[in-house]
Amino acid sequence: MKVAVNGNPLIGLYAKVSEEYAVVGVNHEPLIDAIQEKLDVDVIVTKIAGSELVGAMMALNSRGAVVSDQVLSSELRELEKSLDVLVIETPMTCFGNNLLINDRGGIANPEMESSVVEKVADFMDIELVKGTVGGIKTVGMAAVVTNRGGLANPNINEWEAKKLQEVAGVEVLTGTVNFGTDMVGSGLVANSKGYVVGRDTTGFELGIVEEALFP
């Protein structure tokens, strides 16, 4: 399903999803309805650290959510109604940008402090290693992985792809969304049940998204 938020097709900036939940930073009915319908999740509507861009600000898997200590107490209360939440003090506050994870493992921005990587891995019960995707450090925007498959920036190299596939436990294909956007995490939200993409995604791109996420 294709959606835009007030004309913006970068829907991955506004939402973060797991197998059971989605956190959405804007009270935008078309996006919320699409996520509920296609991903079969309960939706939590809240900002993170005062920002609508929750896709950039938080990490999420079936174990729970990770946010920085910039999160507001009212936002934290909203999240904790449904999720276990780990709050970490770190200068690298955009966990959604800097972590690429599923329920098995993932990649962290190579500049993330090792102590933070360890805390996240322990809390989320995953194998987490530092790395890049297509040379990009903001790995959470450079690719999307679910428990079934993954779609990565077309510039990912063989070594990066092998590393990601090993830790996430899924095969990863390369592609774009939104008519050529290679930062696929900015325009795609997905779990093992379905996906929603930005409105500008072409039919050709959709075919690759389908093949990547549902092999």
Curated annotation (Swiss-Prot):
Gene3D superfamilies: L-arginine/glycine Amidinotransferase, Chain A (3.75.10.10). GO terms for biological process: cytosolic ribosome assembly. One of its GO terms (molecular function) is ribosome binding. Pfam families: eIF-6. It comes from the Archaea. InterPro entries: eIF6. Binds to the 50S ribosomal subunit and prevents its association with the 30S ribosomal subunit to form the 70S initiation complex. Belongs to the eIF-6 family. This is Translation initiation factor 6. It comes from Archaeoglobus fulgidus (strain ATCC 49558 / DSM 4304 / JCM 9628 / NBRC 100126 / VC-16). The gene is eif6.
